[in-house]
Amino acid sequence: MSEKHRGAAVAALLLAVCPLAAQPQGQPKQPPQPMSFFVTSTGVGNGANLGGLAGADAHCQKLAEAASAGNKTWHAYLRTQAAGNQPSVNARDRIGNGPWYNSRGARVAASVADLHGDTIEAARLGNNVSKASVFTEKNESIKGFGDQPNQHDILTGSLPDGRAYSDGADHTCKNWTSGSDGTAQLGHFDRTGGGNTSWNSAHPSRGCSQENLVSTGGAGLLYCFAIN
């Protein structure tokens, strides 16, 4: 074997035994992105009566602060309908611009358009909201379809595109102030029964009480997004 061939053989052997030697050195590992999205570990406790948008946002903020993420401003992913002199509010318009990351540093969506599948490509791919990537502010998994109890229903009041209904019916339990009469549109964080769009708009609740929400597979939980 020539000196040239012998050198090549030794180099190949070293790479096989010590593959790390082939990797570039001096590249520090990037720290994980801080949490900017979670599902609440608990509901408010009064069904869909959240105290309006302000009460829902305060619930997200309180849980985030307890998880050492209170340096951000948190909003609940909720839609309201026009009432009195107040116009409707789209859920997609109150959560900032993204990107958003879960409690383990994985990206859930790059932007509002990515989150809602506004383009054909984004709609085909879907966002990263799923049972494998959605966690609470405590970095805990949530019980979904097939678990006991099933708690995959998430309050949203929203159409799949994150916008408001135009049919005049109540989809928000009286703009999140009723714990009895009315109904609320629910999403499935695990996307069972509805494909890519079911994360935020799967079916209506049976009512607005805590018992009503539990009966269809929920616990009055919310999506929380950091807006900054």
Language-model regions: role of each:
Residues 1, 19-21:
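A composition/secondary-structure signal for short, hydrophobic, low-basic-content segments
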Residues 10-19:
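Bacterial N-terminal signal peptides
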Residues 1-10:
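Bacterial N-terminal signal peptides that target proteins for export
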Residues 23-228:
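Secreted/extracellular ectodomain signature
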